[in-house]
Amino acid sequence: MVEYNTICIAGPFITVRASQIQNYVGAKYQDDLKFPYGNDGTHTFFAKDHQYLKDSLFAAGSQAQIKAHAGSFVKALELYCESVPDVSRKGLPRVLIVIEESSDRWTNDYKTIEMELMANYSVYCMRASFPEIAREARVDPESNILYFRGKEIGLVYFRAGFEEGPHIVTKAEDLADGPDFWKVREMIELSMPIKLPSIDFQLATFKKFQQQFSDRAYLDKVAQSEELVNRLGKVFSTIWSMENLGVEGAEINEVYKDAIAHPENYYLKPQKEGGGNNLVNDEIRQKLQDLDDPELKTYIIQKRIVPPLVDTYHCVKGGYYVSESFIEIGIASSLFTKFNAATESSPATNVVIDSQMIGMFCKSKDSSVKEAEVCKGTACLTFPLPIPTALIQEKSKGLAKGKLEMTVKI
């Protein structure tokens, strides 16, 4: 696993649209697309008609992913209604999407889920920036219910505030001229709506957890069993915090030396979510050598994964180009937890209420660029064509039973 994002749910929506284009191309040019199976004349491309795929979240072009994502929002609103009963409430409360004030280039990412929620669940979404929330939101002092523009809010979905900066007021004039963003966030966190994500996950980011989970000594201390230690150790790529740089005996000291000598083997990442932040190659060496930089200890360093490369057609702005690319597969899921405060007899706990896999997407990333991003045209969304093992065995008798769980065709 390269990373674990706790905020974005965008990819599967747009990927479903991309798969429709791929289906069209596959159907129109099936005789020219030489897939490895189907020597009996039946092209593997049409494995998408298999019943397994029709009923699966993996079905190319399927609306199942969109429905599953919307269903997770509805589940959150239902849990909210259970915890905040109100006999006068008609239908489900609204979703408040918190966005950046100046620009929001990701609007199309979540418009799909807005339409799905409204069309099939009669759930309405409202978008607002921190300043707008400061001006137009209020919390009922008795029920602790959050209202925005007079409407009850059951779920707050943060598309802004990926770092601590927007929440902190450092100058007196900021208090006079604008809202205290931290106070706005505090108001939201202390009110009743379910938060996506909660502030502890959003500000820490999962990179911090990933760093801890890659530490065998830490896992030995906190994991409940040796089996769990081994499972987690296999999932997370090697990653180190810069916080311990210079501490005697810390593993990061040797990693630091190796990263300066061989920066091509590492990524240097800030504790942020979202793209465009990673440092690579000579950028790593320059950053690591500036030991006086106060930001340095907020970074984490990760061993670089070198995936296989394939020649890929990237369709961008009405044209295309061919490049050596690698494929990144993302799995989307929903996780609901309930926090139980510590008591005299027991520590604080987070209890898992529900956990579901709700979709997937793929990106073809140009290997020649520093950090491939779809919005910059250096990566393209794509969709896999999974083929059940049984179908592969049916088409190719020479394949060993159980050798493949699924085959992905891009």
Enumerate the predicted regions with their spans.
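Domain-scale recognition of functional cores that engage charged ligands
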Residues: 5-404, 409
